[in-house]
């Protein structure tokens, strides 16, 4: 069995996928460019990947391929309909980061509500505290987390856990119904109503044609000027141009992002550049999922997916 891992550096070097118990060859590449994917995959029975794109045209040229083992939860880099038509199994790993991502979101909430970014940056770049003439200074807003309203968009594993933890902190939690829904399900609140009420909006919905640019100029305009946006879901859920305009013009109070539309971003990405000067914009490099325990769970489950597929033949 020939197994090829196309983007080994997409998971931390400290964690390796356990090798299968059955006879196999295992080849790894740090990363794979689109023009390299076919050549590296053409003789593979199993491809392991996180983000390498497999569309219908490419999959149709890989008659040996039996399984794509995804080292992630999301599968939007794979044409799932084409894989099904061609008899290629696709196995992902849901739920492995159900502790790590919610904890990251909570960290972002506290960072935004207590203006950690601005206060820390002042000390690093301008010695503001040393020259202020007082034991403290309050240049940036500090607001309580307890009592704030959290609007959760996406009530899956991650969104539900974020909501549970937020309630333990004394927050009021609203789960948003789908945009434009004709009926409001029990336990949900109408989409626009959540945007209008929330002090913090956090995104945990999958990326689909419907959710792309879910947060745009129109939806940002519905948010309070004192509200914050958090995105640890998928970059394209947010219109980055509209978000930057909202931040620079005070239409919302701040944002924290773990994902961007293009990853890795270009050096001149406007949001990246803005984060160097704005005290209310926090960007982390898609690491919300990557706690030690989460990555351990991930690599073990990928290995188990491969073992189970070969043992069961499906």
What annotation goes with each model-predicted range?
Residues 136-225:
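Rossmann-like dinucleotide/phosphate-binding beta-alpha-beta segment
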Residues 1-44:
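N-terminal glycine-/charge-rich "phosphate-binding" loop or analogous flexible N-terminal tail
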Residues 30, 71-72, 88-99, 177, ...:
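Short beta->alpha connector loops at strand-helix junctions that form conserved
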Residues 53-65, 210-229:
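Rossmann-fold NAD(P) dinucleotide-binding segment
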Residues 44, 62, 197-198, 226:
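An anion/phosphate-binding loop that grips the pyrophosphate of nucleotide cofactors and donors
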Residues 52, 73, 199, 205-207, ...:
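Short glycine-/small-residue-rich Rossmann-like dinucleotide-binding loops
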Residues 86, 94-149:
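Phosphate-binding beta-alpha-beta segment of Rossmann-like dinucleotide-binding domains, i.e.
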Residues 226, 232-314:
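Rossmann-like dinucleotide-binding domain for NAD(H)/NADP(H)
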């Amino acid at each position: 069995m020939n197994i090829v891992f196309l983007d080994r550096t997409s998971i931390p070097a400290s964690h390796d996928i356990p090798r299968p118990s059955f006879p196999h060859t295992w080849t790894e590449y740090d990363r794979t460019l689109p023009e390299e994917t076919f050549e590296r995959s053409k003789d593979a029975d199993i491809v392991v990947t996180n983000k390498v794109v497999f569309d219908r045209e490419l999959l149709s040229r890989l008659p040996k391929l039996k399984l794509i083992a995804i080292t992630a939860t999301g599968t939007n880099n794979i044409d799932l309909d084409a894989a099904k038509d061609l008899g290629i199994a696709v196995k992902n790993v849901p739920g492995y980061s159900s502790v790590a991502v919610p904890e990251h979101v909570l960290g972002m909430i506290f960072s935004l509500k207590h203006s950690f970014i601005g206060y820390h940056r002042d000390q690093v770049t301008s010695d503001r505290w040393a020259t202020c003439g007082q034991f403290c200074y309050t240049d940036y807003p500090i607001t309580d987390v307890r009592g704030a309203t959290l609007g959760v968009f996406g009530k899956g594993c991650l969104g539900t856990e974020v909501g549970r933890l937020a309630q333990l902190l004394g927050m009021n939690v609203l789960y948003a119904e789908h945009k434009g829904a004709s009926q409001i399900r029990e336990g949900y609140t109408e989409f626009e109503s959540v945007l209008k009420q929330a002090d913090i909006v956090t995104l945990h919905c999958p990326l689909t044609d419907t959710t792309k640019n879910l947060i745009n100029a129109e939806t940002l305009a519905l948010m309070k000027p004192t509200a914050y946006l958090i995105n640890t879901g998928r970059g394209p859920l947010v219109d980055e141009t509209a978000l930057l305009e909202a931040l620079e013009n005070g239409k919302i109070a701040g944002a924290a992002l773990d994902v961007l539309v293009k990853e890795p971003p270009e050096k001149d990405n406007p949001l990246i550049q803005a984060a160097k000067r704005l005290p209310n914009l926090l960007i982390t490099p898609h690491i919300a999922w990557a706690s030690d325990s989460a990555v351990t769970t991930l690599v073990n489950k990928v290995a188990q997916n491969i073992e189970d597929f070969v043992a069961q033949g499906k």
